[in-house]
Every structure is written in C-alpha cells, then in structure tokens.
Amino acid sequence: MLADIAKHSAIEVKLPKAHKKNSSSGSSSPTSPATRGNNKRSASWTDYGTPPNAAWLHEKIKFPAKTHVTKVASKLPPTANGIIYLPGAEDKYYEDSDQGPAFRQRRHFYYLTGANFPGCAVTYDLHKDHLILWIPYTDPRTILWYGRTPTLEEVRASTDVDEVRYVAGVNRYICASLTPGASIYVLHPDQAPQLESPKGVVQIDTHSLRPAIETARVVKTDYEIAQIRRANAVSSAAHRAALSRLSRLGNERELEAIFAGYCIAQGAHTQAYPIIAGAGPAASTLHYDNNNAPLKPHQFVVLDAGCEWNCYASDITRTYPIPGSFSAEAKAIYHAVLRMQRECVERIKPGVVYSSLHLHACKVAIEELLRLGILHNGTKEEILARGTIAGFFPHGLGHHVGLEVHDVSGRERLLLDSKSSLGPAGGVKSARCRLSPSKRELVLPETLAVMFRDEMKEGGGGDGQGKGVVQMQKAKRSAGGGRQRLEEGMVVTVEPGMAYFLDVPYHAHFINKKALEQYWDLGGVRIEDDILVTKTGYENLTDVPREIEEVLKVMNPS
C-alpha cells in the first residue's frame, strides 16, 4: 500500500463542491478506476476519490498583509501610538543534534506578513500607516546546503506590504522612527527589539497587541476563507480515499498512511495536528495518537485528520464501521451523533450564541439515549439539569479554525467550563463558570447543570436567540464576559460525540448499565465538519460522507 501511495498521484480535474444551508454534507462517489489495454487496473489517486481541481488548488493569491494589519490596528486602544514589532520564528535544532523539527512560522507573525520562512521580522508604523517586512539576506555559502530565501522582489510580489527590506536594518529603523511618547507594541517581553541608541525612554507595551491580533483573527478575510476552503478540499478527498480502502486494511497505521500520503500527493505536506486513527476503545480517546492497533470487526474506527494549506488548518472527523457494515447497535449510536451534528449545523447563522448549540446537542443526545434505553428513570429535563449527559458527550461541541486548528477566539469564548464544589450526594452547591480557551477541554456535568439552570431561569429557548440568552449576553459576568455570538466570516467546527460514562453514584440513577453493555466494545463516535458562517446562514466546507447510506456506498462500491 505504501508503494502505491509513493508511486501514483494522478489528478483528475474537478471543482470541489460547496454545501450551503439546508444541504447535507454529501460526498463524491469514487471515480471509476482507470483501465489499460489488457483491462488490468492501473492504480492512481482517482481510485480513492476525486481529487480537488489542481489549477484552483494551486492558484497564486497575493497575501492581504495590509488588510490584516489595519484590522489589528483598529483593535488597539484609541490612544495607541508608535510601532508594532513582531519577530518571526527561527530554525530550531534538537538537543545534541544537527537535525531539527520542520520549520513552523509564528502564527501571529504570519497573519501580518504571509512570510513562511525563518529569520524575518515585521514593523508597522501606526501614525504613517506603513508596513515593512524584514527578511534575511542569504549568504551565498549557505545556498548549497539550504537553498536561497526569496528575494526582495519575490516577496514584494507575493504579499501586500508597503516595503520589503533586509532584516539587518530593522533596529536602526525603529530607533530612527520612534517619536517622543511613542510605544513599541510587542506580544511578549522577550520579543522586544534590542535597541542600541533609542531616542529617549522607550515604552514597551506587552499588553495591547495580543488581544488586538486575536480579536482581528476571529472573523476571517476572503483570503483566509479561500485557504481554509482548499485545506478542506484536500482533507475531504483524503478522507474519502481512506474510507474507500478501509475494508481492506488491518491496522490503524494503514489508515493514517493513506490519509497522509494522499495529502502530500496533492501538495499539502503538513498536517494541522497529529492524525488520530483509533479503533474500538481508542475511538473514545479524544487525542489518541498511537495509531498502531489492529482493526477488529464489529468496532468503530475514528479518523480525525486535517491538513494545512498555506498555514491554514482543516479539522475533519469521521467514524466508520469495521469492516464495512453497521450492526444494529452501531447504527443506533451513529444515528444519534449524526442527528446531534445535523441539527446543530442547521442552526448556525449570525447572532447565534455558540454555547446554545452545545446545549442543544446535549438535549438531542439525551433524547436518543432515552430512546435506546441507555438512559432511564428520568425526563430529558431532569437528566440535563443534573449534567449526566456530560459522561457520554464529555467535550466541547467545537472551536474556531484558522491559522491554528484550535484557533484564537478573541476577547470572548465559544464555550464555558466550570470550577464547582459539590454539595451533599454530589449535588451542585456552587459553580463558578469561566470562559474556556479555544482548545478542546472537558465539559463537566456541573457546567451543563449551570447552563441548563440559567436557560430555564432566564427564559432562553436554546437557540441562542431567546430573551434569556440576550440578557446573559448583555450581562457581563464577573467571571469573564459574555458567550460568543457567531458572526459572518467565522469558521467553526461542529463535532458532537458519544463516548464513555464516568461512573459516579450521583448519576447512576439515570444509567441503565445492562443496556449500556451492548455498546461498550463498539468504541466512540465523533462527526466533525468545518462550517463557514455566511450572511444568512452557513456553508459546510467539508465534503466527506456522513449519512449511513453514503458511507456504505463508498466502502462497498459493488
């Protein structure tokens, strides 16, 4: 199989599909295999699914550096005056070695420049509205070993900066440009420039720039959406390639190899995060990365994988039955998660409070588990009020996607977590909610209890539009502000899941352990798409089969 991956990379030209609101996340059928004169099959990537249009995929688009930096400047305090300064990343080496990891540019720096090579810096004069990218000069003696960096002219043609200069002069420029009372805005104290002869006292501001950049990055520009769209096109095709071969695979690592090889063949050399290929019990581990266990019949396998395109991430998850059919139990659990995802995606539009989608997913999960008899001895409202569903759906519904797979979310956050103290018999005595960071974290039962209690108390309808939710948005909580509303231009994931139950006596009353035993060995289920918020709704950027009939058709084309 690895030989096939290395040898064949034929590309069929076909534009990727886009999914608008009220359309399901459909799939492309596998392309018919190519044949030669003797009717023997000629292996190529088109056997595994239709690749993205190569001309569209590799189209050169000038990086909108000036647009990005002016967005950032608008988020700084109104009195801001001086120079924004960011150094780029440098090459790194492993300890006691002349080798090192692949270069990875600092994401905030890349957002302002589009420069993806080491040794650079950027300055932006707030008063003059002047953006300069500073690049390293390549010593001719090093070209033999490492090649050359782009020239001044080549860089200027690729990114919309006002000027490109060699980095050796950056400190002299800053010293000459500073005026009395001006500041240098940096992300961290250790990134401040080392100035030899500044004019008077230099004010270094380390507090204003980071929130300004992170807020600017939340709503994507057209360029950023184009790159995320391309990352999704390649990753979607790679998922279809892996799905089409799954019934012939014997180990998780083979699934990983097909996905990674396909992405590389299309020009996406970097994964946005380590590929997760986990079967059976490992399918319930959110960040599983061993990818080395056998694929056993009558289990699920989760493939959570997405490549980068021009530093922009994709994040796609699918769950498939091994070897290629759903048992009754597998179909029931998969349908529950699919319904959670489908209904949450359909609710996406500007103005919706994202955390309300998580709460809706929890309600759907409870309805489905009650239907299957896994939950019992209570109503949907009683089970949700206690937070029991967090044992089955233990992680957040999603996150922003951009230059990071778990991208920044600005001054507000998508979801809430909690620090709680439990009263008698595990009851919630108090819960102190805080805004969670963008990375995926556990959503505790106490958190759900607080969210549900607030919704009931304040009259929210669970759709992010109700009176209670509006009141919560306006009332800036002492714990850290309002819950984030979706805006046009955001790209977020929707990834509900069904996993294990945390065995706590406080929740045992609602759990039918005998019924649950039928589902333990299957493993977890997660389904995840990348969703662009549009003016009136959403667009699903991901094109991978998720409906049961579509999945089986690709796995069993005959």
Curated annotation (Swiss-Prot):
Family annotation (PANTHER family): XAA-PRO AMINOPEPTIDASE 3 (PTHR43226), XAA-PRO AMINOPEPTIDASE AN0832-RELATED (PTHR43226:SF3)
Keyword tags: Aminopeptidase, Hydrolase, Manganese, Metal-binding, Metalloprotease, Protease
SMART domains to which the protein is assigned, alphabetical: AMP_N
InterPro entries documented for this protein: Aminopep_P_N, Creatin/AminoP/Spt16_N, Creatinase/aminopeptidase-like, Pept_M24, Peptidase_M24B_aminopep-P_CS, X-Pro_dipept-like
Lineage: Eukaryota, Fungi, Dikarya, Ascomycota, Pezizomycotina
Record protein name field: Probable Xaa-Pro aminopeptidase PODANS_7_5850
Top-level taxon of the source organism: Eukaryota
Entry's family note: Belongs to the peptidase M24B family.
Protein role: Catalyzes the removal of a penultimate prolyl residue from the N-termini of peptides.
Residues where Mn(2+) 2 binds: 304, 315, 528
Biased composition regions of type Polar residues, renumbered to the chain: 34-46
Organism: Podospora anserina (strain S / ATCC MYA-4624 / DSM 980 / FGSC 10383) (Pleurage anserina)
Keyword Metal-binding: yes
Catalytic activity: Release of any N-terminal amino acid, including proline, that is linked to proline, even from a dipeptide or tripeptide
